[in-house]
């Protein structure tokens, strides 16, 4: 592990008045060397002008702390559904995704995580075709270095992007290979039915490499799960408090095939004295030390 380049961080906020500059400061307070942001609220399309983001100040602070822009992540909003059964919804999704790609590029970031969407009453093949058709339309419309990273999903409702076969179908049919990648989410993988112990995760990576190519994995979301394997529910838990377990997550984080790939925490905030606080700083320290401790009990005992 001494030679392992651990790139670890969390989701951080991007809000007035410091915007991107404030995101960097928040990430540094957690001991991170990467982070992920939404460019606005994930539930809507309302966005502030990119000129207000304090990009130059953010870049200067990143450079001061030797954080590589290529290791940072933007997450597209949840409302983008590339495989909606309604054409007007797909058109809105395409136009807004183009704008998100352009915002991501303006920030100097090269990775944009996208939920592949929910097919609703459509069959799987049609839904998958709609996703790769939209991506092909986008990449033929704009020239960009941004990589759209399809997130592995939990299988809640009619979600797609749940398994390697679905991801392979999309990636095989996207013409601009430089613009497509995958984000592995450990909670979603568990909830979709994948056992994430050492042996089974190795088998998953072997299959992924054979079917798609390990080089397409661009980012990981590191979360424990509140649910049993195969629950198809998607409820994140703090590291070591869920059904995946800290030891299994450490094996994933430090897997030799995943060296130099950013790992992002999206774990829940914790209620202490009626105040919700992030545990990212503590979780990142545990990851760096490869040692778990009961931070929740420790914080509650200070009441």
Swiss-Prot record:
Zn(2+) 3 binds at residues 188, 234, 236. Zn(2+) 1 binds at residues 75, 115, 151. Zn(2+) 2 binds at residues 151, 185, 221, 266. It catalyses: Endonucleolytic cleavage to 5'-phosphooligonucleotide end-products. Pfam families: AP_endonuc_2 (PF01261). Gene3D superfamilies: Divalent-metal-dependent TIM barrel enzymes. SUPFAM superfamilies: Xylose isomerase-like. Its cofactor is Zn(2+). Binds 3 Zn(2+) ions. One of its GO terms (biological process) is base-excision repair. It is an enzyme of class 3 (hydrolase). Keywords: DNA damage, DNA repair, Endonuclease, Hydrolase, Metal-binding, Nuclease, Zinc. Its EC number is 3.1.21.2. It comes from the Bacteria. One of its GO terms (molecular function) is deoxyribonuclease IV (phage-T4-induced) activity. HAMAP family: Nfo. Endonuclease IV plays a role in DNA repair. It cleaves phosphodiester bonds at apurinic or apyrimidinic (AP) sites, generating a 3'-hydroxyl group and a 5'-terminal sugar phosphate. Belongs to the AP endonuclease 2 family. This is Probable endonuclease 4.
């Amino acid at each position: 592990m001494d030679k392992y380049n651990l790139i670890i961080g969390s989701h951080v906020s991007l809000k007035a008045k410091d915007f991107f500059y404030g995101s960097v400061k928040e990430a540094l307070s957690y001991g991170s060397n990467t982070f992920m942001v939404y460019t606005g609220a994930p539930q809507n399309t309302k966005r502030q002008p990119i000129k207000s983001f304090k990009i130059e100040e953010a870049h200067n602070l990143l450079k001061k702390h030797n954080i590589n822009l290529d290791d940072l992540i933007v997450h597209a909003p949840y409302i983008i559904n590339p495989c909606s059964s309604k054409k007007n919804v797909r058109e809105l999704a395409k136009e807004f995704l183009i704008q998100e790609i352009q915002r991501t590029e303006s920030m100097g970031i090269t990775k944009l995580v996208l939920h592949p969407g929910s097919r609703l009453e459509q069959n799987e093949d049609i839904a998958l075709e709609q996703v790769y058709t939209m991506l092909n339309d986008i990449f033929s419309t704009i020239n960009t270095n941004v990589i759209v990273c399809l997130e592995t999903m939990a299988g809640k409702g009619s979600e797609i992007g749940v398994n390697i076969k679905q991801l392979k179908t999309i990636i095989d049919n996207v013409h601009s290979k430089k613009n497509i990648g995958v984000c592995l989410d450990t909670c979603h993988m568990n909830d979709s039915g994948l056992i994430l112990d050492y042996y089974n995760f190795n088998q998953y990576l072997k299959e992924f490499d054979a079917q798609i190519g390990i080089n397409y994995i661009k980012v990981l979301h590191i979360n424990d799960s509140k649910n049993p394997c195969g629950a198809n529910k998607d409820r994140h838990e703090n590291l070591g408090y869920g059904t995946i377990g800290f030891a299994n997550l450490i094996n994933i984080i430090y897997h030799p095939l995943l060296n130099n790939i950013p790992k992002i925490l999206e774990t829940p905030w914790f209620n202490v004295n009626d105040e919700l606080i992030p545990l990212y700083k503590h979780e990142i320290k545990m990851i760096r030390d490869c040692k778990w401790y009961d931070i929740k009990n420790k914080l509650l005992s200070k009441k």
